[in-house]
Design a protein with these regions (language model features):
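Alpha/beta enzyme core
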Residues: 4-12, 27-52, 60-76, 84-198, ...
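Cofactor-binding active-site loop characterized by glycine-rich and histidine/acidic residues
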Residues: 56
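Active-site-adjacent C-terminal substructures of enzyme catalytic domains
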Residues: 186, 191, 198-201, 254-262
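Glycine-rich beta-strand-to-loop/alpha-helix junction loops that act as flexible
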Residues: 206-209, 229
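Extended, intrinsically disordered, low-complexity segments
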Residues: 244-282
């Protein structure tokens, strides 16, 4: 089927109290793995690319990969720009054909975050492309993204932000972090519930790799509708490739070792689709 926007699938997730996994992809094999997992479990899915991934292979390459994967799939697939760090990059993604765009103004002042988010929302509206924003700051470091120590989302600011921007979904900072955790993260679940009380749009959880599955499931019960995974996909792919090459040190065919990495990613994605509750929701 054609690529879908995230609005429709996230609203269904919100209505039916589950979440959709959004998986950061770095190459063709990861795109194939994520969509294969979604097909097998009859789950809607979101493919994501970060600015650093876009630098590696450009927006149009990843869009083309996602478009072909979606056309071959029998489940809804969206292609999302994760952590778009400028209005210009967001517009490039819009022109290429991305069906969902995040504009990340979380390191700007509250007023400037509203301003840039509103500009992207207004620009995307004629194409009915979904827009995600972030309020508060998810900590940690991943790719070219450095969230520092992070800063929690204030529920009343979240309400004002959504009202003034008209954004379609909101990433909230409740204690998660990008990259690899040094210890078990401690999430402020009560804060999440407070945000959910005053914000009507779907909420997004970033920095989920390494968060215990039962904690993620509790976040979904408290209103999270989109759950982002990135670091653990890289680990899974690299694990498969490394193990194959360790057993076959003379291997020179990328198809052979990359296919093992692809299978590791597929297994990981399937496990997380069960966690977020999206199985059989396509």
């Amino acid at each position: 089927m054609p690529l879908v926007t995230t609005e429709k699938i996230l609203l269904d997730a919100q209505k039916n109290k589950y979440a959709i996994g959004a998986f950061n992809v770095e190459n063709m094999e990861m795109v194939m793995a994520v969509v294969a997992a979604a097909e097998e479990l009859k789950s809607p899915v979101i493919l994501q690319t970060t600015p650093s991934t876009v630098k590696y292979a450009s927006l149009d390459y990843f869009y083309a990969n996602a478009k072909v994967a979606a056309q071959k799939a029998s489940v809804p697939v969206a292609i999302h720009l994760d952590h778009g760090n400028s209005f210009e990059l967001a517009m490039q993604a819009l022109r290429v054909g991305y069906t969902s765009i995040m504009i990340d103004g979380s390191h700007e002042s509250f007023e400037d975050n509203i301003k840039v988010t509103k500009a992207v929302v207004d620009a995307c509206a004629p194409s009915k492309v979904s827009v995600e924003a972030e309020l508060g700051k998810v900590g940690g470091k991943e790719d070219d993204l450095d969230g520092g120590d992070g800063g929690y989302t204030d529920p009343l600011e979240a309400k004002e932000f959504v009202e003034k921007t008209g954004v379609g979904s909101l990433a909230v900072a409740i204690g998660t972090a990008h990259g690899v955790y040094k210890g078990e993260p401690k999430l402020d679940l009560d804060r999440l519930s407070e945000i959910k009380e005053v914000v009507s749009i779907p909420l997004v959880l970033h920095g989920t790799s390494g968060v215990p599955d039962d904690t993620v499931s509790e976040c979904v019960r408290r209103g999270i509708c989109k759950v982002n995974y990135a670091t653990d996909l890289r680990i899974a792919f690299s694990k498969g490739v490394k193990e194959y090459l360790a057993q076959n040190p003379d291997a020179i065919d990328p198809k052979k070792y990359c296919s093992v990495g692809r299978e590791e990613v597929k297994k990981y994605v399937m496990s997380k689709m069960h966690v977020v509750g999206s199985v059989n929701k396509a």
